[in-house]
Amino acid sequence: MFSQEPPAQGKRDRDCALKITAIDFRWPGNRHFQITIESFNVKRGERLLLLGPSGSGKSTLLSLICGIMTAQEGRIEVLGKDIAAMSAAARDRYRAEHFGIIFQMFNLLPYANALDNVLLPLSLAPARW
């Protein structure tokens, strides 16, 4: 019988696209809404569906992951980068280079299709040129 050793910590971190650790988020002034995630990882290449009823926090969670908002506690790493540790300008650049999101309240180019609207920020990101 063969046993396989778990990958070294560095290898596991490189395989991780998203790592959420001990996140706690509350909207200011709203004690009834809270997102708490103790631990959650998504590997590179893994697909994920975020499904829930209206008001359950899906858009808020995406805003935390892509750095539009920051949590009061915890850590979110995307491709090994701690999102909250970045300045607001650095988060904006990182989001433009690594994310394609259309939220509920969106501004689309009316002459472009959905894919072109999602990909537009990538064409404006310096790292993509």
How would you name each of these model-derived features?
Residues G74-D82:
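Conserved ABC transporter NBD signature motif
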Residues A112-P121:
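Short coil-to-helix segment of the ABC ATPase nucleotide-binding domain corresponding to the Q-loop/switch region
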Residues C66:
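Helix-to-loop junction immediately C-terminal to a conserved catalytic motif
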Residues L48-L50, L62:
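Short hydrophobic beta-strand immediately N-terminal to the Walker A/P-loop
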Residues A89, D116, A125-W129:
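Short coil-to-helix "N-cap" segments within the ABC nucleotide-binding domain's helical subdomain
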Residues I83-G100:
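ABC ATPase NBD coupling module
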Residues K11-A17, F25-E38, A88:
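A short, flexible loop at the N-terminus of ABC-type nucleotide-binding domains that lies
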Residues P53-S56:
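Walker A (P-loop) phosphate-binding loop of ABC-type ATPase nucleotide-binding domains
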